[in-house]
Amino acid sequence: MEKASMIYEGKGKKLYNTSHPDQVVAEFKDDLTAFNAEKKGNEAGKGALNCQISTEIFKLLEAEGIKTHFIKQLDEKNMLCKRVSIIPIEVVTRNIATGSLSKRLGIKEGSVLPFSLVEFYYKDDALGDPIMNDEHAILLKCVNSQEELEFLKETAREINEILRSFFDSKGLNLVDFKLEFGKDIEGNILLADEISPDSCRFWDKKTNEKLDKDRFRQDLGNVKMAYEEVLRRILN
């Protein structure tokens, strides 16, 4: 599938039109960003790793009945996807307290939550992607109804159950992760974006070593090695 004009460039990917009106190509970038792009870096090979990791996870989820925008991986950095209109909500699911949750509510980092917590954030870089509730989402017309919000929550929880079990079998704790959804031309809500160490936190079950973008956020080093380790475990 040939790329045509670029539609959009985000922090981690570029999106391109194709000859098919309902399909786009997502090119995964080597760029690293943190703290709403206040911190920037680059890691050669990171884009290819995220593309392959996302491919494997989308395949897993599709096999479990989750509808996604994924069609196929084209090459090491490019993925063919269904065209969707992104819903401006970041759906964050948390299993272990860390990051902004610990800072915001004073929950000790590393505390296992008694239930999986699903949060909504308004997808707006200029505002810093603020946390919001259901009524905010409807007020801002992010969705058409409360039913659509419930679908996002239920799907996030279903994905969480699938991925927690999968990564547990690989010796990894799925600490938390961010999902994005979009609507296809028929109005169906599909899982979109990516699922990778850029959008998930993975901790080694034995050592609690961080194997995700926190290595960049916190200047821990060995970012590429961490992403490679996640991919190795997924494939083994």
From Swiss-Prot:
Pathway this chain belongs to: Purine metabolism; IMP biosynthesis via de novo pathway; 5-amino-1-(5-phospho-D-ribosyl)imidazole-4-carboxamide from 5-amino-1-(5-phospho-D-ribosyl)imidazole-4-carboxylate: step 1/2
Cysteines paired by S-S bonds: none
Keywords attached to this entry: ATP-binding, Ligase, Nucleotide-binding, Purine biosynthesis
Keyword Ubl conjugation appears in the UniProt entry: no
Secretion signal, residue range per the UniProt entry: none
BP terms from Gene Ontology: 'de novo' IMP biosynthetic process; cobalamin biosynthetic process
PROSITE patterns, sorted: SAICAR_SYNTHETASE_1, SAICAR_SYNTHETASE_2
Reaction(s) catalysed (UniProt annotation): 5-amino-1-(5-phospho-D-ribosyl)imidazole-4-carboxylate + L-aspartate + ATP = (2S)-2-[5-amino-1-(5-phospho-beta-D-ribosyl)imidazole-4-carboxamido]succinate + ADP + phosphate + 2 H(+)
CDD domains: SAICAR_synt_PurC
Keyword Hydrolase: no
GO MF annotation terms: ATP binding; phosphoribosylaminoimidazolesuccinocarboxamide synthase activity
EC top class named in words: ligase
EC number: 6.3.2.6
Superkingdom, natural source: Bacteria
InterPro entries: SAICAR_synt/ADE2_N, SAICAR_synt_PurC, SAICAR_synth, SAICAR_synthetase, SAICAR_synthetase_CS
Pfam families the UniProt entry points to: SAICAR_synt
PANTHER family: MULTIFUNCTIONAL PROTEIN ADE2, SI:DKEY-6E2.2
Family affiliation: Belongs to the SAICAR synthetase family.
Protein name (Swiss-Prot/TrEMBL): Phosphoribosylaminoimidazole-succinocarboxamide synthase
